[in-house]
Regions:
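Low-complexity, Ser/Thr/Pro/Gly-rich disordered linker/stalk regions
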Residues: 1-302
Length: 302
């Protein structure tokens, strides 16, 4: 991504972001074979098509992962990017009513609501009729209705560069409905390694860190990651069983044990689990040019 490639809008006013990623979790026509005709279109509207596909790692299970990255020597130490992450799978039919009640709506009820409102991120707005410059009827967002839909939060595990460091960050959220205002997020440069930053429901832990200058350049670096995903208590919002994280880094016939099978809170209290994606995920409003190579992803359940 170049300096002018931050084109995704809808975040903070006047802020755009840059993304270029490949996801291991996806669905094909075969995954919808035998389902009712409207199953696919309904899933599109609810943004849950990928929930029907391959690559999902259920909450509370144990997995081994591997992938490789090649960082060019000319990459600036000022970049702020996540190059690999495991993401949660929020269910948008989980909603919060104006009176604060959290409930899971039947798909038909959620879709009926969606027909009468405008949903942006996690906020539900009144749908207001207006006309565009050509005189055509269009809908725009009016006042917030007080309803919110589940949108997810920070990735449960991320590998990236920020503030002149390479870092591995694990996040946990035991809240049944994600509180987007709870910005519990460990700073890659300031947080102590393996000392979680916590709020009432969340934990964010820098599991490993090294100066950007020490990260191997112009060669393939292979990561082997073993995760026992934390088991959560659903609506009870409890930790049933903490997780574990083990990370090896290999290059030039050498290995480095970055995270030594540490007990850690890692995951989200979603009904579904997690999926892997890698690429360029610019963080914040960074426009520093980013280019690197990624390859060799594989996962298996242990």
């Amino acid at each position: 991504l170049g300096r002018d490639d931050n084109t995704l809008e809808g975040y903070a006013p006047g802020e755009t972001k840059g993304r270029s990623e490949l996801a291991w979790c996806y669905a094909t026509a075969a995954d919808f074979a035998g389902l009712p005709d409207k199953a696919y279109s309904d899933a599109q509207r609810m943004k849950t098509v990928y929930h029907h596909g391959k690559g999902i790692c259920p909450q509370g299970t144990s997995w081994s992962y591997t992938f490789a990255v090649r960082i060019p020597a000319e990459l600036s130490p000022e970049v702020s990017t996540i190059f690999a992450q495991w993401h949660g799978m929020p269910d948008r039919t989980l909603v919060t009513a104006p009176d604060g009640r959290v409930m899971k709506l039947p798909a038909e009820e959620f879709l009926a609501m969606q027909d009468t409102v405008i949903i942006k991120k996690d906020i539900v707005y009144e749908r207001v009729e207006t006309v565009d410059t050509k005189g055509n009827k269009v809908w725009k967002a009016g006042k917030p209705t007080g309803w919110k839909v589940e949108q997810g939060g920070y990735p449960p595990l991320a590998f990236g560069f920020s503030n002149g460091y390479f870092y591995i960050k694990a996040n946990s959220d035991r809240r049944w409905f994600t509180d987007k205002t709870d910005r519990c997020n460990a700073n890659a440069a300031k947080a102590k390694v393996m000392v979680p930053v916590t709020s009432e429901f969340k934990a964010s832990t820098i599991a490993a860190r090294m100066p950007f200058s020490e990260f191997p350049k112009d060669r393939w670096v292979t990561f082997t990651v073993e995760i026992d995903w934390t088991q959560y208590g659903g609506e009870a919002e409890t930790i049933v069983r903490p997780g574990r994280l083990d990370v090896w880094m290999a290059h030039d016939s050498r290995t480095n044990h970055l995270v030594d099978n540490e007990q850690i809170l890692i995951g989200r209290n979603d009904e579904d689990g997690y999926y892997f994606k890698f690429g360029i995920y610019r963080v914040g409003d960074s426009t520093e040019p980013v280019s690197y190579n990624l390859a060799g992803y594989a996962q298996r359940q242990r």
